[in-house]
Each structure stands twice: as C-alpha cells, then as structure tokens.
Amino acid sequence: MENTVLFTAEERSLFFQLFKRLRNDSPEMFEGDRYRTLKHHLAVIIGQGRFHRGMFNLNPIIRSMQTAILSAEDIGLKNDSLIACLLMPYITTEEELDDIDRLYGKNVKVILHGLIHIRELYKKSPSVESENFRNLLVSFAEDMRVILIMIADRTNLMRSIKDTTNDEAKLKASEEAAYLYAPLAHKLGLYQIKSELEDLSLKYMNHDAYYLIKNKLNATKKSRDEYIRRFIAPISEMLTQAGFKFHIKGRTKSIHSIWQKMKKQKCGVDGIYDLF
C-alpha cells in the first residue's frame, strides 16, 4: 500500500519555507477570492485521497510548489502558470477542466488542457528521445507555457531524485531529461537549465565520469579563476576608458559539455584545453 502520510516533519518545515518564497514570487496569487478558492480546492482534492507520492516517493504538494517557484524565478512565468503548476498533479482528465475554467479562468484551463494532452502522448509513444517526438510534443502542447512548465517540472524532479533507490526509474528520468527536455530548454533559450539537466543526467547515468570531471574542476578552480581574472582585466580597462557601461562574465564549460568533448577527442580531462 502506498505511503499516504501527508507531511513528514522535514516536509512540513519545507512547506512553510516554500509557501513564503512562492508568496514573495507571486503576491497577487495569495490575494482575495482566488487564493481562498485554490486553498479550498487543494484541500478537497487531498481529502478525496488523490495524494500520491509516485515511484520516487516525492510529496506532490512539495514538488508542485518547487516547480512553481522554479517557473517563476528561473523562467519568469506568472500567476496563471503558477496556479497550473500547483494543480498539475491532480487534474488528469478533460472532464475536470470546466470546473477549472469556472474557478480560475480560461488561461489556467488552457495550460492544464495542454498538460493532459502531453500525458496522453507519453502513454502512446514508445520512444520520447527522438526529434519527431519533441516536435509532436510542442504541437500537442498548444501553449508554450505548457512546455515551459514541463521543463521546470523535470528540472525540479532531477534535483529531487538524488537519493532515490529506484535506479531504473532514475535512469529513465535522466535519459528523458538529456534527450528530450535539455534540447527543448536549449531551443527556448533556457541555457542554464539546459546545462543543469545535462549535468544531472550525466551524474545519474555515468556517475564515474561525472565525478572524474567535477573533482578535476574543483582541484583547478583557483587557477582557472585567476586565468579568467587576468584575461578580463585588460578588456575591462579598455572598455572603461572608452566610456562604455558593461558587464563581463566568464564561466567554465558544463561537466556534460566537457564529457562530450572527451568522448569526441578520445582523451582525458587534461586533454581538453578550451574549458571556458
């Protein structure tokens, strides 16, 4: 029988932290009738026994709040999308959408309708890693906010499953993150999220390669930071003298990107010289 404990002590503490953060991200969502409606709606859903931790034993309330926060802070999604994030684990059939339209408006209904379509597409497709599936997914979504929420949810999932004992499910989630969600994030200009998805996928799919590169980067961080500082200094001075307002950034390639170069060039970490 599935564990249906609503909150562990740790989850309860995390819930209040996330609630405060989400309220700061979208204060209008916590004002007036809409918030009271959402609060009551979620309470009814949970009271009906529609609280499922799933194969990774993750609390769906915590997960949906984390996805909403990531959607707001890292992607810039607004109120309607965040409400859809919070309702996403529970609204699974089109029959429920009329109530969503009445309670929250057309935008939330459209987003949840797209998410339901994507779930149906997942069930029908034998392989989600192909370019054809990515194109099909975008067309099924109908609204780009659906794709953005899916990317946010998968990023949140990848952050959350590091301690899971379900290795088969973790591997499948990692493959989908690497071959489906990371390319979608790249196409939409979410480069930091794309790199994070790729790095976490490598961490779970090839633990040894990930930590080989990570440990090497950690060991050489001081010298790399100094190299970047010395490289930027004369450029910064010239731009300042010319009267420009500017900001220069420098960063190391992602672990996944370094690993791809190692495979392509058939060399170790020390054989990769363009780390920046």
Regions inferred by a protein language model and the residue ranges of each:
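N-terminal alpha-helical scaffold/docking segments in eukaryotic complex subunits
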Residues: 13, 29-34, 38
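Short N-terminal amphipathic alpha-helices
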Residues: 54, 77-84, 96
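Glycine-centered helix-coil hinge/cap
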Residues: 31, 104-108, 143, 206
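Nucleic-acid processing machinery
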Residues: 1-26, 44-55, 60-65, 69-76, ...
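Hydrophobic or amphipathic alpha-helical targeting/insertion segments
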Residues: 84-114, 118, 166, 190
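Short, solvent-exposed loop/edge-beta patches enriched in aromatic
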Residues: 72-80, 103-106
